[in-house]
Design a protein with these regions (language model features):
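Surface-exposed alpha-helical segments enriched in charged/polar residues
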Residues: 49-50, 112
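A short helix-loop-beta-strand connector motif used in the catalytic cores of GNAT acetyltransferases and
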Residues: 50-62
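Acyl-donor (CoA/ACP) binding surface of acyl/acetyltransferases
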Residues: 1-27, 60-173
């Protein structure tokens, strides 16, 4: 993308719901690494009606550049012992937005947002071992590869290995 500074994150609006539903229900958009079969088509509308898709334990923000929708980022709370938690984040970009640096920029923006507005020390992201583009985007965004997770994702009839990444608050300092 020519001007990655124009890529921003913003809350989901009601007008975004058809785009979100289309992305989540399209094997073409979710392929090759995020298609897990059909799922509840009303899930996003119910979440939006409940809390605007900005809940205390999981949330979604749109990735946009001007009026162009590029995809979305999400995060969910992972509780650890003693009331401690961290975030696990993910991304889904439309095919036209891939390979342009948008994923790297979106990961950076979301990590900065979460560290600015929550007291977590750590944010994780994971992807399939064969998703080299996502691994590169995470590394360019400042995430550190921590290890291989064997047989962690069941997709397309078989178990697949994943790769775990993290970024710490001090990594952004």
């Amino acid at each position: 993308m020519d001007d990655l500074d124009q890529v921003v994150l913003r809350p989901v609006t009601e007008d975004d719901l058809p785009v979100l539903n289309g992305m989540l229900s399209s094997p073409e958009v979710r392929a090759p690494f995020q298609w897990f079969g059909w799922s509840d088509p009303g899930r996003m509308a119910r979440g939006f009606a409940d809390n605007g898709l900005l809940g205390p334990d999981n949330s979604i923000l749109m990735v946009v550049s001007g009026a162009e929708t590029l995809g979305f980022v999400s995060w969910r709370k992972i509780d650890v012992a003693g009331g401690t938690y961290f975030w696990n984040m993910g991304i889904l970009l439309l095919p036209a937005a891939r390979g342009r640096g948008v994923g790297t920029r979106a990961h950076q923006l979301l990590a900065r947002y979460l560290f600015a507005h929550t007291p977590v020390a750590r944010i994780e992201a994971d992807t399939e071992k064969d998703n080299i583009a996502e691994q590169r985007a995470l590394e360019k965004a400042g995430f550190t590869r921590e290890g291989l997770m064997r047989s962690v994702v069941f997709r397309d009839g078989r178990w697949r290995d994943g790769v775990l990444y993290s970024i710490l608050r001090e990594d952004l300092a």
